């Protein structure tokens, strides 16, 4: 009997519950590197677009695989995905977001250097990047800027590998520390900075120090509001993606424990790249790998008996392009049935 079949009493082995939960506003998809996070997030976005007014898919992974998945170039501005009328995507560069904040939009770097200001901008940037997790925090700040100007019903995050994802979720406290540090420096070295900046007291981007502080304070208030939403299970959930191997299972357990410490809801796990050897198969390698996968699948079902555990098969070709993603996405809501289960 195939291990892909689940007892009737178990949680439904699909992500249908996410589609049915109309109140969800924020959905994170994350896990260890190389387990199929991007494929899963793209596929979930496609399914959500069928039942939501508007969906935004965002990559916060520096690798930025959304463009490869949909065979379409995306950038830091939300853009409709070809073939859809209500599904958009964007890829955010955390470093670029920070540089925009510090250097200012459209700042003339050559002119700044000529005025002796370039060094000041570099110092501020070095100071900012010295704060742990600030790159992820600014990545989210860029997201908020987009989301506030465009009203999306649901936002899906294709996150960076596990460690970065968990740091990303600490951004409110990170920005609190950043603001405290800047305030401290401003009060301690304000006169010195004003003397260095000249009579107008302007930073390289043309802003004054108080203006920059005011913008950061507004950003902090917005992020605090969103952080409250993140801890509301009616508005936010996290989908864990893994494969049936020891390291991936270990990372998933660590991530679930840490999400719980942040009070962030998670009740769905997608297990990718599962082998389902055909009856009579003579592939010893396939059988051995299947036995290993079964061992870890059994552990997943035992550990997470109150989760929706979705089991996705290993495919013979890459899942790239709209048509293949749509086909893959169907298996997220309609459990995959191995060929031998039909007999």
Curated annotation (Swiss-Prot):
Gene3D superfamilies for this protein: P-loop containing nucleotide triphosphate hydrolases (3.40.50.300)
Annotated EC: 3.6.-.-
Active-site residues, record numbering mapped to chain: 61
Keyword Glycoprotein (UniProt): no
Keywords, comma-separated and alphabetical: ATP-binding, Cytoplasm, Endoplasmic reticulum, Hydrolase, Metal-binding, Nucleotide-binding, Transport, Zinc
Molecular-function annotations in GO: ATP binding; ATP hydrolysis activity; guanyl-nucleotide exchange factor activity; identical protein binding; metal ion binding; protein folding chaperone; unfolded protein binding
InterPro entries given in the database record: Anion-transp_ATPase-like_dom (IPR025723), ATPase_ArsA/GET3 (IPR016300), ATPase_ArsA/GET3_euk (IPR027542), P-loop_NTPase (IPR027417)
One Pfam match: ArsA_ATPase
Localization of this protein: Cytoplasm; Endoplasmic reticulum
Domain of life: Eukaryota
GO terms classed as biological process: cellular response to oxidative stress; pheromone-dependent signal transduction involved in conjugation with cellular fusion; post-translational protein targeting to endoplasmic reticulum membrane; response to heat; response to metal ion; retrograde vesicle-mediated transport, Golgi to endoplasmic reticulum; tail-anchored membrane protein insertion into ER membrane
Top EC class, one word: hydrolase
Residues binding Zn(2+), per UniProt: 283, 286
Record flagged with keyword Metal-binding: yes
Subunit structure: Homodimer.
Family to which the UniProt record says this protein belongs: Belongs to the arsA ATPase family.
Known function: ATPase required for the post-translational delivery of tail-anchored (TA) proteins to the endoplasmic reticulum. Recognizes and selectively binds the transmembrane domain of TA proteins in the cytosol. This complex then targets to the endoplasmic reticulum by membrane-bound receptors, where the tail-anchored protein is released for insertion. This process is regulated by ATP binding and hydrolysis. ATP binding drives the homodimer towards the closed dimer state, facilitating recognition of newly synthesized TA membrane proteins. ATP hydrolysis is required for insertion.
Name of this protein: ATPase GET3
Protein species of origin: Pyricularia oryzae (strain 70-15 / ATCC MYA-4617 / FGSC 8958) (Rice blast fungus)
Gene symbol of the encoding locus: GET3
């Amino acid at each position: 009997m195939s291990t892909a079949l689940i007892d009737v009493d178990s949680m439904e082995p699909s992500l249908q519950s996410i589609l049915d939960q109309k109140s969800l506003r924020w959905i994170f998809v994350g896990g260890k590197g190389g387990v199929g996070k991007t494929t899963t997030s793209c596929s979930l976005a496609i399914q959500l677009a069928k039942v939501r007014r508007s969906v935004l898919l965002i990559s916060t992974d520096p690798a930025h695989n959304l463009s490869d998945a949909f065979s379409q170039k995306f950038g830091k501005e939300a853009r409709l995905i070809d073939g859809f009328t209500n599904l958009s995507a964007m890829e955010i560069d955390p470093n670029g977001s920070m540089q925009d904040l510090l250097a200012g939009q459209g700042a003339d770097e050559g002119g700044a250097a000529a005025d002796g200001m370039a060094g000041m901008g570099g110092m501020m940037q070095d100071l900012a990047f010295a704060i742990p997790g600030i790159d992820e925090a600014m990545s989210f700040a860029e997201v908020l800027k987009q989301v506030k100007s465009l009203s999306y019903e649901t936002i899906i995050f294709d996150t960076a590998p596990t460690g970065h994802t968990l740091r990303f979720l600490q951004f409110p406290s990170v920005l609190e520390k950043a603001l405290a540090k800047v305030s401290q420096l401003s009060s301690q070295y304000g006169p010195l900075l004003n003397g260095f900046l000249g009579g107008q007291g302007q930073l390289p981007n043309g802003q004054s120090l108080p203006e920059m502080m005011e913008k950061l304070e507004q950003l902090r208030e917005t992020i605090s509001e969103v952080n409250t939403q993140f801890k509301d299970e009616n508005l936010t959930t996290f989908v864990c993606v893994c494969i049936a191997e020891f390291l991936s299972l270990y990372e998933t357990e660590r991530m679930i424990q840490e999400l719980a410490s942040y009070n962030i809801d998670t009740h769905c796990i997608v297990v990718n790249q599962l082998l389902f050897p055909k009856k009579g198969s003579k592939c010893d390698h396939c059988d051995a790998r299947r036995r290993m996968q079964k061992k870890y699948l059994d552990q997943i079902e035992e550990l997470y008996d109150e989760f929706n555990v979705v089991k996705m098969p290993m495919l013979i070709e890459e899942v790239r392009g709209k048509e293949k993603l749509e086909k893959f996405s169907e298996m997220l809501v309609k459990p995959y049935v191995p060929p031998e289960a039909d007999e």
